[in-house]
Amino acid sequence: MDSYFSAKNSTLAGDMNATWPASHGFNATGDPPSMSITRLFPALLECFGIVLCGYIAGRANIITSTQAKGLGNFVSRFALPALLFKNMVVLNFSNVDWAFLYSVLIGKASVFFIVCVLTLLVASPESRFSKAGLFPIFATQSNDFALGYPIVEALYQSTYPEYLQYIYLVAPISLMMLNPIGFIFCEIQKSKDTQNASQNKAKIVGLGFLRVLQNPIVFMVFVGIAFNFILDKKIPVYMENFLDGLANSFSGSALFYLGLTMVGKIRRLKKSAFVVLTLLITAKLLVLPLLCREMVELLDKGDSVVNHTSLSNYAFLYGVFPVAPGVAIFATQFNMEVEIITSGMVISTFVSAPIMYVSAWLLTFPTMDAKPLAYAIQNVSFDISIISLVSLIWSLSILLLSKKYKQLPHMLTANLLIAQTIVCAGMMIWNFVKEKNFVGQILVFVLLYSSLYSTYLWTGLLAVSLFLLKKRESVQLPVGIIIISGWGIPALLVGVLLITGKHNGDSIDSAFFYGKEQMITTAVTLFCSILIAGVSLMCMNRTTQAGHYEGFGQSQNHKPVEPGSTAFEENPAPTNEPELFPSSIPETSCCSCSLGNGELRCPSIEPVTNSSASGPMPSSFEKTDHCVSRCDSQSCILAQEEEQYLQSGDPQLTRHVLLCLLLIIGLFANLSSCLWWLFNHETGRLYVELQFFCAVFNFGQGFISFGIFGLDKHLIILPFKRRLEFLWNNKEAAADRESPVSEEIKMTCQQFVHYHRDLCIRNIVRERRCGAKTSAGTFCGCDLVNWLIEVGLASDRGEAVIYGDRLVQGGVIQHITNEYEFRDEYLFYRFLQKSPEQSPPARTLRDHQEESYKEIGHSSPPSVSPKT
């Protein structure tokens, strides 16, 4: 947090205070604020808490993606239309400020056309029109109803309740006027892709407008306006309760569905996608709010100065609302730019929360005096530090319990998290240090700023480490030097500052404790870290052979196996990347998976006809399995390989790249703050908001780390899910002691054994050595998931995992050491011997089933990577 507040610059503060009139958007008159800030944080907690619950439900596979479609249909086809119809019927158009509406519309149109033109100029010819159609919609369409309305209601319900109705007017107007242009571009791209250049231009335009009319938001707005005049702004009693029931169900279900749709959206992104995402999110969350606010300032000349200022502030907050999920639906319908749009929707949703909080805080602040603002920033920093400290302790515990801190790059990430933890603790201690306690201030300052500079520097060092990890077949990663630099250089800088700097004893702000010298030191540290991180990430992109990053939790570069660590010999890999599981069996790896383009891929599931040692198992599988008892994890080679994979097989490069990019954004904000203070004494409203943003970033970095590393699927989410299921099953078992396995699981297992088991064994089971003289017929969890999807027993990977878990509970399959539940990962499982009651039915039915499998196998697409 780099602030200008100090007694040394009191004259500057006075001049600054004189240049901030009410027209700048702040309440500088001492009048009551135009919005209720006390209700904002509970509203944000409510909205994002429900979103998080939905995300956890999807991540833990409690609700699969197929099941989530039902909730999505209810939200879009019943709850939202009822909400729109109800509010459009009772809307009083005589109270609407139409100047405000067209000002916001002009602001959105400006961003739309800027993004569209720049995309047409820069994008490659192959996908120019699809990008020019979807990117402007992404930058202008907000999540007005699910996220926007609860926040506007919390802020303005008690002061300007009429502002709530603008939500229902701005969204459909922009949809009707801007979205058709984007749809027309997408139809043009669709025509080019199908090589149908002769398609009628009028038909393309008509299809664009037809998609708009099919949108339930637009359709129900027209119907609601018509009934507004027919019913004279009053809903009949017999309809009111029915509409209320549907409309009231929208908010919670829509937010929960939003969380469900976020699972697995950040997937394989091309090397330029992160740059595109950064630009689009900047346009949506920064450029759009500023333009909307300035348009209202220029065009809406109301009679009341207070109301005019409040409307301009409202326009800014409206622009900060995150991207609507509907944009991802449009991208999926056209099958264009799906990865960028869906990933951007997820990121913008969570980035918008702190921006909304900071903006609303500033817009309601009663005065622009320097001293109260400095205390306000201190209070915000203290509050955020408390919550961030808890998040960081949780994230560090995850790294320790999962033992990921022993591997790279998590070892370096742990150092970053420790530095962030010390920053939060230092800020909390600084808040209690007396201003007259010089020694105490010096000691806490050293603790606070040596760790803060360390977080700045660790961003660059982590990016360098990621680049070196990509190149480590030719470059050895100097871990010791990096760790010493990450802690030693910041300590050295603070020591030099203590010796050469001039202490400002009257400052209550730690960011200006040593005045100009401290600002220069901070700026140099930030610039160096940004430069190092930026260059490293660009070089890392250039060295990525496949031209894409992998999704969260997926492996992209694996730690090489040390010689002699297992009894298997290393085979030549098709790329320069080391193999995850080396094998002595020449024709296949131990996991039936191969490395291609730097990533693990499971092969397509089809019958193998070779007669190698690792060939497919015969249907009489039980007779050839020599290791039928549970393996000892201490001696079983396969179990040792699993342990090696779990500890070092997933460096989570995409998570680390995303962490670096988000931290670089905060570093840019801090650098801008320093340079603004050093070279421009004409501070203004944007500068003050920049200070709050810097405070939120510096002491809230723990939220970023928690979001990326704190929700470990297998260490947190799935065990919590299993614990709930255990407690629930205990209650059911108390009522029925004789049925430990549910009838549903029994039925699933019986059907699988009777109709699918033998064919599944022939397709995916491979015989692998598990000891010096023993072998076992095993398969990977991801192999079974792929097979279940291809033969139609599951519609997606989530349902396939549920199916596999039922087979484990029913005793059909088992993990080789019986230590893990069924996972969509490279873990080894075996089929258990058939029990006497599992005898198959007539052979003719099985033959018919196999015939249908063969037809599916010939037409099935290549398998996809496992979901983690």
From Swiss-Prot:
<keyword id="KW-1133">Transmembrane helix</keyword>
<feature type="transmembrane region" description="Discontinuously helical; Name=9">
    <location>
        <begin position="314"/>
        <end position="334"/>
    </location>
</feature>
<feature type="glycosylation site" description="N-linked (GlcNAc...) asparagine">
    <location>
        <position position="27"/>
    </location>
</feature>
<comment type="function">
    <text>Cholesterol-binding protein that acts as a regulator of mTORC1 signaling pathway. Acts as a sensor of cholesterol to signal cholesterol sufficiency to mTORC1: in presence of cholesterol, binds cholesterol, leading to disruption of the interaction between the GATOR1 and KICSTOR complexes and promotion of mTORC1 signaling. Upon cholesterol starvation, GPR155/LYCHOS is unable to perturb the association between GATOR1 and KICSTOR, leading to mTORC1 signaling inhibition. Binds indole-3-acetic acid and may play a role in tryptophan metabolism.</text>
</comment>
<feature type="topological domain" description="Cytoplasmic">
    <location>
        <begin position="263"/>
        <end position="271"/>
    </location>
</feature>
<dbReference type="GO" id="GO:0034198">
    <property type="term" value="P:cellular response to amino acid starvation"/>
</dbReference>
<feature type="region of interest" description="PIN-like transporter">
    <location>
        <begin position="1"/>
        <end position="368"/>
    </location>
</feature>
<feature type="topological domain" description="Lumenal">
    <location>
        <begin position="434"/>
        <end position="436"/>
    </location>
</feature>
<feature type="topological domain" description="Cytoplasmic">
    <location>
        <begin position="458"/>
        <end position="478"/>
    </location>
</feature>
<dbReference type="GO" id="GO:0055085">
    <property type="term" value="P:transmembrane transport"/>
</dbReference>
<keyword id="KW-0446">Lipid-binding</keyword>
<feature type="topological domain" description="Lumenal">
    <location>
        <begin position="99"/>
        <end position="102"/>
    </location>
</feature>
<dbReference type="GO" id="GO:0035556">
    <property type="term" value="P:intracellular signal transduction"/>
</dbReference>
<feature type="topological domain" description="Cytoplasmic">
    <location>
        <begin position="711"/>
        <end position="868"/>
    </location>
</feature>
<keyword id="KW-0472">Membrane</keyword>
<feature type="region of interest" description="Disordered">
    <location>
        <begin position="550"/>
        <end position="582"/>
    </location>
</feature>
<feature type="transmembrane region" description="Helical; Name=8">
    <location>
        <begin position="272"/>
        <end position="292"/>
    </location>
</feature>
<dbReference type="GO" id="GO:0050890">
    <property type="term" value="P:cognition"/>
</dbReference>
<feature type="binding site">
    <location>
        <position position="264"/>
    </location>
    <ligand>
        <name>cholesterol</name>
    </ligand>
</feature>
<feature type="transmembrane region" description="Helical; Name=3">
    <location>
        <begin position="103"/>
        <end position="123"/>
    </location>
</feature>
<keyword id="KW-0812">Transmembrane</keyword>
<feature type="topological domain" description="Cytoplasmic">
    <location>
        <begin position="58"/>
        <end position="77"/>
    </location>
</feature>
<feature type="transmembrane region" description="Discontinuously helical; Name=7">
    <location>
        <begin position="242"/>
        <end position="262"/>
    </location>
</feature>
<dbReference type="GO" id="GO:0005765">
    <property type="term" value="C:lysosomal membrane"/>
</dbReference>
<feature type="transmembrane region" description="Discontinuously helical; Name=4">
    <location>
        <begin position="132"/>
        <end position="152"/>
    </location>
</feature>
<feature type="transmembrane region" description="Helical; Name=11">
    <location>
        <begin position="380"/>
        <end position="400"/>
    </location>
</feature>
<feature type="binding site">
    <location>
        <position position="41"/>
    </location>
    <ligand>
        <name>cholesterol</name>
    </ligand>
</feature>
<dbReference type="GO" id="GO:0015485">
    <property type="term" value="F:cholesterol binding"/>
</dbReference>
<feature type="binding site">
    <location>
        <position position="655"/>
    </location>
    <ligand>
        <name>cholesterol</name>
    </ligand>
</feature>
<feature type="topological domain" description="Lumenal">
    <location>
        <begin position="366"/>
        <end position="379"/>
    </location>
</feature>
<feature type="transmembrane region" description="Helical; Name=2">
    <location>
        <begin position="78"/>
        <end position="98"/>
    </location>
</feature>
<feature type="topological domain" description="Lumenal">
    <location>
        <begin position="1"/>
        <end position="36"/>
    </location>
</feature>
<feature type="binding site">
    <location>
        <position position="55"/>
    </location>
    <ligand>
        <name>cholesterol</name>
    </ligand>
</feature>
<dbReference type="InterPro" id="IPR051832">
    <property type="entry name" value="mTOR-Rac_regulators"/>
</dbReference>
<dbReference type="Pfam" id="PF00610">
    <property type="entry name" value="DEP"/>
</dbReference>
<comment type="subunit">
    <text>Homodimer; via the transporter region and DEP domain. Interacts with the GATOR1 complex; preventing interaction between GATOR1 and KICSTOR; interaction is disrupted upon cholesterol starvation.</text>
</comment>
<keyword id="KW-0325">Glycoprotein</keyword>
<feature type="transmembrane region" description="Helical; Name=13">
    <location>
        <begin position="437"/>
        <end position="457"/>
    </location>
</feature>
<feature type="topological domain" description="Lumenal">
    <location>
        <begin position="680"/>
        <end position="689"/>
    </location>
</feature>
<feature type="transmembrane region" description="Helical; Name=1">
    <location>
        <begin position="37"/>
        <end position="57"/>
    </location>
</feature>
<feature type="topological domain" description="Cytoplasmic">
    <location>
        <begin position="124"/>
        <end position="131"/>
    </location>
</feature>
<feature type="topological domain" description="Cytoplasmic">
    <location>
        <begin position="540"/>
        <end position="658"/>
    </location>
</feature>
